[in-house]
UniProtKB/Swiss-Prot annotation:
<feature type="topological domain" description="Cytoplasmic">
    <location>
        <begin position="223"/>
        <end position="228"/>
    </location>
</feature>
<keyword id="KW-0472">Membrane</keyword>
<dbReference type="Pfam" id="PF04535">
    <property type="entry name" value="CASP_dom"/>
</dbReference>
<feature type="transmembrane region" description="Helical">
    <location>
        <begin position="202"/>
        <end position="222"/>
    </location>
</feature>
<feature type="transmembrane region" description="Helical">
    <location>
        <begin position="114"/>
        <end position="134"/>
    </location>
</feature>
<keyword id="KW-0812">Transmembrane</keyword>
<feature type="topological domain" description="Cytoplasmic">
    <location>
        <begin position="1"/>
        <end position="65"/>
    </location>
</feature>
<dbReference type="InterPro" id="IPR006702">
    <property type="entry name" value="CASP_dom"/>
</dbReference>
<keyword id="KW-0961">Cell wall biogenesis/degradation</keyword>
<feature type="transmembrane region" description="Helical">
    <location>
        <begin position="66"/>
        <end position="86"/>
    </location>
</feature>
<dbReference type="InterPro" id="IPR006459">
    <property type="entry name" value="CASP/CASPL"/>
</dbReference>
<dbReference type="GO" id="GO:0005886">
    <property type="term" value="C:plasma membrane"/>
</dbReference>
<comment type="similarity">
    <text>Belongs to the Casparian strip membrane proteins (CASP) family.</text>
</comment>
<dbReference type="InterPro" id="IPR044173">
    <property type="entry name" value="CASPL"/>
</dbReference>
<dbReference type="GO" id="GO:0071555">
    <property type="term" value="P:cell wall organization"/>
</dbReference>
<feature type="topological domain" description="Extracellular">
    <location>
        <begin position="87"/>
        <end position="113"/>
    </location>
</feature>
<feature type="topological domain" description="Cytoplasmic">
    <location>
        <begin position="135"/>
        <end position="149"/>
    </location>
</feature>
C-alpha cells in the first residue's frame, strides 16, 4: 500500500456543507420592543377662580349711587301722586239743609279741572311704578345711556302733565276758598269743609310729586352729560 507525502483532507462529520450559490443563513433575533414609558400623570387642572366683582367699583361708583338715588326718588314720588289721586276721588261731600229733601252736593267730577287733576295723578303714579324696573336696570348697568335717555324723556312728559294738572286744581281750590266778588261767586268751603280739605291736601301732595320729578329730570340730565 503506497503512501503519499500530500496531506489528507479531513472533513469533519459534524460540519454541515454550505449550499452552493446561496447566502449563508443568518439567525435573526427579534429585538424586544423598548419598554413603554410610564404614562405621565394627567396635568392638574385648576378650576378658574371666580373673582368677585364689587357692586360699587371705583370706575362707576358715582353712577351707581346716582342711579340708586333715582330709584329711591321714584318710590318717594309715587306716594304723593297716589295720595293726591285717592284724596281727590274720595272728596265728594253732601250737605243737608233743614231736611233730607234739600241736599247740596260737592263732587270733584263737577269741576273739569279736578277731574283732569285726578286722572293726571293716577297716570303719574302708574308711570312711576312701571319705571321702577327700568331704574333698577340702570342701577345694575350704569353704562346703559339709552335707557337713561328714555327715562329722562318720560319724566319730562309726566312732570309737565302733573304740573299743568296741579296748577289747574290749585286755581279751583283757591276759588272754592276765596270765591270771586266780581263774579258774585261765594266761597263754598265754609259749608263743604271736607271737600275743601281733601282737595287742598291733594294739591299740596301733587306739587310735592312735581318737585321730586323735576329733581329726577335734573339728576338724569346731569348724569347723561357727565357720561357723554
Amino acid at each position: 500500500m503506497s503512501t503519499s507525502d500530500a496531506a489528507a483532507t479531513v472533513i469533519p462529520i459534524d460540519d454541515v456543507p454550505r449550499q452552493h450559490g446561496k447566502a449563508p443563513a443568518v439567525d435573526t433575533v427579534t429585538a424586544a420592543p423598548p419598554p413603554l414609558a410610564a404614562a405621565a400623570p394627567p396635568a392638574a387642572t385648576t378650576a378658574p377662580r371666580k373673582t368677585r366683582v364689587p357692586f360699587f367699583r371705583r370706575a362707576d361708583r358715582g353712577s351707581r349711587c346716582v342711579a340708586l338715588l333715582d330709584l329711591v326718588l321714584r318710590v318717594a314720588a309715587f306716594g304723593p301722586a297716589l295720595a293726591a289721586a285717592i284724596a281727590t276721588g274720595t272728596s265728594d261731600e253732601t250737605l243737608s239743609v233743614f231736611t233730607q229733601f234739600f241736599q247740596f252736593h260737592a263732587r270733584f267730577d263737577d269741576f273739569p279741572a279736578l277731574l283732569f287733576f285726578m286722572v293726571a295723578n293716577a297716570i303719574a303714579a302708574g308711570y312711576l311704578v312701571l319705571s321702577l324696573p327700568f331704574s333698577a336696570v340702570v342701577v345694575l348697568r350704569p353704562q346703559a345711556i339709552g335707557l337713561r335717555h328714555l327715562l329722562l324723556i318720560c319724566d319730562l312728559i309726566i312732570a309737565a302733565l302733573l304740573t299743568a294738572a296741579a296748577a289747574a286744581a290749585a286755581a279751583i281750590v283757591d276759588l272754592a276758598h276765596s270765591g270771586n266778588q266780581r263774579a258774585n261767586w261765594v266761597p263754598i268751603c265754609m259749608q263743604f269743609h271736607g271737600f275743601c280739605q281733601r282737595t287742598s291736601g291733594a294739591v299740596v301732595a301733587s306739587f310735592l310729586a312735581v318737585l321730586v320729578l323735576l329733581f329726577l329730570v335734573i339728576l338724569a340730565a346731569f348724569t347723561i352729560r357727565k357720561r357723554c
